Amino acid sequence: MATHTRWVGVKGHGTDFNGKSIKTSDCGQLADAALYATHPSMFDQGVDGKKFDGLANNVGQVRFGGDCYAYGLLALGHVDLVVEAKLQFYDFMALIPVVEGAGGVTSDWQGDRLGRTSDGHMLAAANETLRDLVLNHLCV
């Protein structure tokens, strides 16, 4: 391992980081939340861009970069939200047990479960409260 970091998430079990159990944050307000996305170009200038911008204007902090590392940071409790678009199922399927095993929740932008036929929109949140607040912005 180049970075000597390893997340292990197994459905039905907790998530470990380098052998230690981890948990997502208990952040319950958008104004306090740290939001990550890989790159602004994921969100087109149309509907996706407007939805993301509306959300980004209501969170405490927005950062770009990190790719899958952002989901690991979410599982560790250092990031509260990861919102992305234009993903393929192989981009997110391995991340779901890592996030959910640490207490987080994942869905598409409509709140539906992710799978092979998902449309490429992903939301990962530290908890259900944050997820519901985000969906109020993305489901308009």
Each language-model region and where it sits:
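Alpha-to-beta junction loops
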Residues: 76-81, 104-105
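Acidic donor-binding loop at a coil-to-helix junction in glycosyltransferase catalytic cores
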Residues: 90
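A generic structural-conservation signal
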Residues: 64-65, 83, 108
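Acidic, metal-binding active-site segment of PIN/NYN-like and related structure-specific nucleases
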Residues: 103-119
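Acidic beta-strand-loop-alpha-helix segment within the catalytic core
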Residues: 1-71, 119-140
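Short secondary-structure boundary segments
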Residues: 39, 85-87, 110-112
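Hydrophobic residues within well-ordered alpha-helices
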Residues: 72-75, 93-101
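Short, hinge-like loop/turn segments at secondary-structure boundaries
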Residues: 81, 100-101, 125-126
